């Protein structure tokens, strides 16, 4: 009789464990990339003339463009100046979550679209490299609410918080920083526009 009772208890416990495991597996895990998807990421000085803008999707893939307008670089063939341009795609992956507001993100792949120099409507378009992002780089992602005191002066410049009338104590937007490239992308909802 004891053997039957033990078997029943074992079967009951096994069934409960399997149900709990199934329930845990059924819960969708939200990746940090799910949160970043649907934002416009912009790296710019705020003064205009140049920017790198990209979109990051939920699977970690991304695409973007870089442009730098040099209206003083002109000639008879292109009297309205020169624009350096680049379109690119790539893939990122999560290295690790550092704390509740910080993640390390690696740029696993970066490809630029092959284009040729051309003159169109008085402007010379020159192929360039993506500015601010590079393959193999490990970038640091900061969530809104991160104290601005953790940032270097260069990082603060790229967050654009110092341009606000009253410098906030915490980030209001997402911020993706690269020490290697000395760059910082601010994440904005796509509906409100990219540049500050």
Task: Describe the residue ranges of each PLM region.
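Short, solvent-exposed secondary-structure boundary motifs
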Residues: 39-48, 81-85, 129-131
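Edge beta-strand at a domain terminus
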Residues: 84-97, 133-196
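Sec-dependent N-terminal signal peptides of Gram-positive bacterial secreted proteins and lipoproteins
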Residues: 4-27
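Long, charged/polar, surface-exposed segments that mediate recognition or autoinhibition
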Residues: 97-146
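Generic recognition of cysteine residues
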Residues: 21-24, 44, 74, 86
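N-terminal glycine/threonine-rich, aromatic-flanked beta-hairpin/loop signature
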Residues: 48-117
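Tryptophan-anchored aromatic micro-motifs
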Residues: 28-53, 172-196
């Amino acid at each position: 009789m004891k053997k039957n009772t033990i078997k029943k208890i074992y079967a009951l416990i096994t069934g409960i464990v399997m149900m709990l495991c199934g329930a845990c597996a059924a819960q969708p895990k939200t990746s940090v990339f799910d949160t970043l998807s649907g934002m416009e990421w912009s790296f710019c000085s705020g003064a205009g003339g140049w920017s790198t803008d990209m979109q990051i999707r939920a699977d970690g893939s991304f695409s973007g463009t870089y442009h730098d307008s040099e209206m003083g670089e002109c000639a008879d063939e292109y009297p309205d100046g020169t624009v350096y341009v680049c379109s690119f795609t790539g893939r990122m992956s999560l290295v690790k979550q550092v704390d509740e507001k910080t993640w390390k993100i690696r740029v696993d792949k970066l490809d630029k679209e092959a284009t040729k120099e051309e003159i169109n409507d008085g402007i010379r378009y020159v192929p360039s490299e993506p500015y601010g992002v590079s393959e193999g780089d490990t970038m640091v992602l900061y969530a809104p609410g991160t104290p601005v005191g953790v940032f270097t002066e260069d990082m603060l410049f790229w967050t654009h918080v110092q341009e606000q009338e009253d410098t906030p104590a915490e980030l209001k937007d997402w911020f993706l920083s690269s020490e290697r490239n000395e760059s910082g992308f601010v994440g904005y909802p796509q509906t409100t526009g990219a540049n500050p």
